[in-house]
Amino acid sequence: MRRDGVFAGLLAALVLLLLPGTALAAPGDPWVAYVANSVVTKQSAAAPVILRADPATGALAEISRNGAQGDLFRHPYDIAVAGDGSLLVADMGAYATSTDHTPDGRIIRVDPVTGRQSVVASGEHLVDPAALTVAPDGLVYVVENVGTARTPAVISVNPASGAQSVIAQGGELCYPFGIAFEPRGSLVVTSYGDFSDGTTVVNCAYDFGALIRIDLASKSQSVLSRNAPEWGNLFRNPLGVTVDAAGRILVVNQNGGTALMGVDPNTGVQDAESPNTGTDRFVVPQRPAVTPDGDVVVSDFTLDDLEGGLVSVKLSTGAQSILRQDRTLFNNPLGVAIVPNRAPAAALSAAPALVAGGRRVSFDASASRDPEGLQLRYDWDLDGNGSFETAGGTTPTITRAYAGTTTLTARVRVSDPHGASAVAGAVVRVDSIRPVLSGLAIRRSTITYRLSEGARVTIQLQRKVRRRWRAVRTLRQNGVAGRNRLRAGSRARAAGRPRRVRYRAQAFAVDVVGNRSRVVRLRVSAAAARRLRR
């Protein structure tokens, strides 16, 4: 395997990393693959269209199909992941014919969490959009396979407004099906070459296809590689194309004995990476995507079960293995996109962490972070039973009141759009038991009492004036569980005290969370009252 120009490739990769919106990935980082099936019905019923494969768990999940999530899919041809984590799908609509070039193609956005479909752009220049790529600045570049005037083109699409602009048209482009963004700031496009199915006939200048570079500054086209002595003779109807982190170009041939080939971005020289013979996994390979480890995942239209799936290629050896195959979910896949996906970091705080029964606790997970900067979703286990019964959407805060006395660990599960998640917990203590104050007694200037738990105790000496009890002195103490003693200090005697007055002591306790005991009252003699008032 050729690895020329590594230093130049690393410099190009550095340029890419400096551009805003570029996701950073390192060898060993976890990742998932998204797949777009090209056939949207099976046995006259809506079938899965967008799938997600997780190589770490082996899981294959359906993300979206026509129905409750939308009804926009007709002929999906490619898929890419936008900077915000949403999925972008190039859909051809109804295939163009020799007499009908109706611009009914679409770029569809799919929410990877809900599967909901929405239109980013449609019509205008989009007749049969065959592929798309997302630049580091978020702009989407689309290969238009046919064109309204039967002239293929490359179209830019603003993902926010859907506005379309023609970047390149005609020229070297002939039956193009693949596009990729290069770190140097240009595009590479695969021209398929000659094609005939009995109805559609395409004749290209380069029978077996070519790789075209488009300079975005000048919008000029040039042939980067094709079948020729100076480049090699490996092109056999190239369809998909991608660029690895070092800037090296990887192309998938739909036909011929070389399924995956590398193309030097500086010289155009071709290098066979993985074969397609009768003993290989490949049958009808379509598009490549590069993993963080530098290996390649290729979509195959049929595989050996005619439904297709994903093939993993170890780039250092060219060895192939089935990454995922499932007759229920795969339906002739074309598009494949890989997104590095490290798990988020979850954080949770509870305030107050110790609370009285019936009062609300506020939970805050806003300190949680996603390594790729994607929006997180929050699911809550507020009763501490281990099941996340409360969906919080994208709101990182929630409140809950607890009635009974308990100690529990509430948890939050934070999930990114691509299925990675993490859990954090916070301990909550709920105290709904009122403190018990008993054994109130006064002997000379000393007050004693008992508490069931530590609490703040308030003791008032009251006298009765005209049928109403009025406080004449208030004492407070932080009591402990068990027996407590409070010695009342002397205070100046009030002047003009009536000689015959009734006195009482009234006491209550409030614990640390605000639970209040019942009031305890004790009749106090005038002599004892005089001592307490001193």
Which residues are covered by each model-predicted region?
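Solvent-exposed loop segments of extracellular immunoglobulin-like
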Residues: P371-D379
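Solvent-exposed segments in extracellular or luminal domains encompassing
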Residues: T394-L408
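Acidic, Ser/Thr
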Residues: D364-E372, R450-S452
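Short loop/turn segments immediately following the C-termini of beta-strands
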Residues: S38-V40, M92-A94, N145-G147, Y192-D194, ...
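Beta-rich, blade/repeat-based domains predominating
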Residues: A26-P30, A45-A47, Q69-D84, D104, ...
